[in-house]
């Protein structure tokens, strides 16, 4: 993160990365985007020097964007985030079924496989 001093850094508005950058990168020129896609487009077009996003999201973007020559660099840093989750209303008629299915996916290793495929 210290390497970003004096650099132009893009973030998505309203995200944990936006909050983190606002608090911790006072020496950087922060560029706030409405979407993470436009932040990455600015990086591809060399309009910014870096994008800050959570690791799984960054890795997913890179893996699923044809012709992207981006890569995740530097050490990961904690933005105070909790692990990823599935959020549904407790009033959803499939609430119990969804919870049971997620528990099965965790237990049988499917979530680990998906994470390795899309987020590493």
Predicted regions and their residues:
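Proline/Glycine/Serine-rich low-complexity intrinsically disordered segments
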Residues: 1-120
């Amino acid at each position: 993160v210290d390497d970003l001093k004096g650099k132009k850094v893009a973030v998505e508005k309203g995200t944990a990365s936006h909050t983190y950058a606002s608090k911790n990168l006072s020496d950087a020129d922060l560029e706030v985007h409405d979407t993470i896609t436009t932040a990455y487009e600015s990086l591809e077009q060399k309009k910014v020097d870096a994008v800050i996003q959570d690791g799984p999201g960054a890795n997913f973007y890179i893996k699923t964007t044809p012709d992207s020559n981006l890569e995740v660099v530097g050490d990961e840093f904690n933005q105070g985030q909790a692990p990823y989750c599935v959020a549904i209303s407790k009033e959803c008629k499939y609430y119990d079924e969804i919870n049971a299915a997620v528990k099965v996916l965790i237990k049988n290793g499917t979530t680990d496989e998906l994470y390795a495929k899309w987020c590493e």
